[in-house]
């Protein structure tokens, strides 16, 4: 007589933060700790240009991601290559923001119930709040 097959129980994975050397996960084996720099005001004069640029890029990325969040469920007009204009109900984007999932895509040749628009094909988009 055979014993019943048991289904293995999934084990949750804990992803540790990056170690002090920047490559490993977890903590340094010799007990080293990285020292955090104190927070500095936004308009500090001694900030290197790289950190100012990084802060500006972070602000622009946050605005872009907030605009994507605001578009969900609203009609959006897209301008594609070759001057093609389409309108659709925005649904979602993938993790890499490489594709937009839309519904009721109105194209010059008809309406598509659901579609994926590649961001590399989009020149601009607009929507009303």
Swiss-Prot record:
The keyword Iron does not apply. GO terms for biological process: spliceosomal snRNP assembly. The modification N-acetylmethionine is found at residue 1. Residues 63-129 form the Sm domain. InterPro entries: Sm (IPR047575), SMN_gemin7 (IPR020338), SUZ-C (IPR024642). GO terms for molecular function: RNA binding. GO terms for cellular component: cytoplasm; cytosol; Gemini of Cajal bodies; nuclear body; nucleoplasm; SMN complex; SMN-Sm protein complex. It holds the Pfam family Gemin7. Residues 1-31 form the SUZ-C domain. It is found in: Nucleus, Nucleoplasm; Nucleus, Gem; Cytoplasm. It comes from the Eukaryota. The keyword Nucleus applies. Its main location: nucleus. Keywords: Acetylation, Cytoplasm, mRNA processing, mRNA splicing, Nucleus. Belongs to the gemin-7 family. The SMN complex catalyzes the assembly of small nuclear ribonucleoproteins (snRNPs), the building blocks of the spliceosome, and thereby plays an important role in the splicing of cellular pre-mRNAs. Most spliceosomal snRNPs contain a common set of Sm proteins SNRPB, SNRPD1, SNRPD2, SNRPD3, SNRPE, SNRPF and SNRPG that assemble in a heptameric protein ring on the Sm site of the small nuclear RNA to form the core snRNP (Sm core). Part of the core SMN complex that contains SMN1, GEMIN2/SIP1, DDX20/GEMIN3, GEMIN4, GEMIN5, GEMIN6, GEMIN7, GEMIN8 and STRAP/UNRIP. Part of the SMN-Sm complex that contains SMN1, GEMIN2/SIP1, DDX20/GEMIN3, GEMIN4, GEMIN5, GEMIN6, GEMIN7, GEMIN8, STRAP/UNRIP and the Sm proteins SNRPB, SNRPD1, SNRPD2, SNRPD3, SNRPE, SNRPF and SNRPG. Interacts with GEMIN6; the interaction is direct. Interacts with STRAP/UNRIP; the interaction is direct. Interacts with GEMIN8; the interaction is direct. Interacts with SNRPB, SNRPD2, SNRPD3 and SNRPE; the interaction is direct. This is Gem-associated protein 7.
């Amino acid at each position: 007589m055979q014993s019943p097959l048991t289904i293995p129980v999934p084990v949750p994975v804990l992803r540790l933060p990056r170690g002090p050397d920047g490559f490993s996960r977890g903590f340094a084996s010799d007990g080293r700790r990285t020292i955090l720099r104190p927070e500095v005001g936004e308009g500090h004069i001694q900030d290197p240009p790289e950190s100012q640029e990084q802060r500006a890029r972070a602000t622009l990325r946050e605005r872009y991601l907030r605009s994507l969040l605001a578009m969900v469920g609203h009609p959006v007009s897209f301008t594609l290559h070759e001057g093609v204009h389409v309108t659709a109900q925005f649904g979602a984007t993938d993790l890499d923001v490489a594709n937009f999932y839309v519904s009721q895509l109105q194209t010059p040749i008809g309406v598509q119930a659901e579609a994926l628009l590649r961001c590399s094909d989009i020149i601009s988009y607009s929507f009303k709040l």
